[in-house]
Amino acid sequence: MNNKTRKVLVPLIAIVFGFLLGAIIMLAFGYNPIWGYEDLFISALGSARSIGETLQTMGPLILTALSFAVAMKVGLFNIGMSGQALAGWISSMWFALSFPDIPRLLMIPLVVIIGMVFGAFMGFIPGILRALLGTSEVITTIMLNYIMLFFSTFMIHSMFQKNILMDNTTDQTKLISANASFRTNWMSSLTDNSTLNIGLIIAIIALVIMAIIFTKTTLGFEIKAVGLNPDASEYAGISAKRTLILSMVVAGALAGLGGVVYGFGYMQNFVSQSASLDIGFYGMAVALLGGNSPIGILFAALLFSVLQTGAPGMTNDGIPPEIVKVVTAAIIFFIAVKFIIEVMLPKAKAIKASEATKKKGEKA
């Protein structure tokens, strides 16, 4: 079995196993899995509005998945997308609410740039610590998630101007003005007043740009080279330290952009968070399922968006929507142990070939 076929089969097998495990759990608790999955897909794709909501969910997932993929290609495990996205969200939201009268054509690029800059800074910290001190990026990105989580709460409680906060609360801001929102009338009317917004277009543009960088540029080659062998890259004249830092900066910028898309496309304000943003961890799952490739990320983001958007529909048959989280976790699990699947597939093929040879020998 060639490598391309394996890259396609392994995620598909993981998805099938994930849905099978979800079905087994539903059966064990007396629910009908066929009805449950039917309600899930109808809820996610059964109307123009639900399709719009599913597509809207894809935007932040694509961007955080790209963030994880960039780091993985250089050999780093970026678990800091939640903190990086949160940094992008709160910084850009603060700007938009503080200067609400900026024209839309100027406001949209500015909030995008601000979110990416602050996300990039959150990626720069673990990048430089890893490059110069050898500090594990896993530990630093996890810690930075918590630092950003609590710092964002401090910011909204103590640093935000009172005139941009919602009345009688310090836990959320007022809604952004129409000139800052990523929602458009034509996208809303096209999908029966869903929250579909230009964030999806921004995410797809980022996807195309990263695909070009990975395959057509010197930077993409250097990232892959350092990821495969840092020492050999240094010998060939590629600075591994510079590439590590730059990769984490790019990863942070993409995650920060994901936070901007989430805030200005879906939320429309900033709300104090009690836990890390889901889009960070789901982005990791999307990247793993998509094999860290842009096209794989696109389809994986669609699947996870369907699962998230359709989950509430399962309650129509009394099935807890948390079952979808089991399916999601199972898919991630089977992707994580894909080497087992990759070993099993060649062995199964070898056994079949051996049996076929024996049968031919017996006939002869």
Curated annotation (Swiss-Prot):
Keyword entries, A-Z: Cell membrane, Membrane, Transmembrane, Transmembrane helix, Transport
Entries under Pfam families matching the protein: BPD_transp_2
Chief location category: membrane
Membrane protein topology class: Multi-pass membrane protein
Single Gene Ontology MF annotation: transmembrane transporter activity
GO cellular component: plasma membrane
Compartment list: Cell membrane
Signals that turn on the gene: Constitutively expressed.
Transmembrane residue ranges: 9-29, 77-99, 105-125, 138-158, 195-215, 244-264, 284-304, 326-346
Keyword Membrane set for record: yes
Role: Part of an ABC transporter complex involved in the uptake of all common nucleosides. Responsible for the translocation of the substrate across the membrane.
Subunit field text: The complex is composed of two ATP-binding proteins (NupA), two transmembrane proteins (NupB and NupC) and a solute-binding protein (BmpA).
Similarity-based family: Belongs to the binding-protein-dependent transport system permease family.
UniProt-recorded name of the protein: Nucleoside ABC transporter permease protein NupB
Name of the coding gene: nupB
